């Protein structure tokens, strides 16, 4: 199993709020709905040299309390299901309907009463050829994912 870890990210919310949101994926629904039509977000995406039409893909994301699924090019639907929760510390996911067997952990730790930090770890069953082709992309993707999760306004969800 190949292992990829993000850098540690600071979060401007207490660990209890972060855990409450990430351990119940249904709580992300309002944020996804708002993001689809957010002009300020579209402008930021343009500034980053990306196509804001990518936000349209958010309508294809399916959420339940324990599962998130989304279409993936050339693969079909990919899903992550929560398989373990450790109160205010960790949420562990497992891939479903994915060509690659993988587990993903989101670890949260308190820093102060009002802030916390997080790190994401991905363990994926990759053959050597695939690892060579996508390893660096997974490393960057996990780090970008952690940065994105650290920016969620947990105190307002």
Task: Please tell me what each predicted stretch does.
Residues 1-62:
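Hydrophobic ligand-binding cavity/cleft-lining segments
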Residues 41-96, 155-156:
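Glycine-rich portal/gate segments that line the openings of hydrophobic small-molecule binding cavities
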Residues 92-144:
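Beta-strand/loop substructures that line and gate deep hydrophobic ligand-binding cavities in soluble
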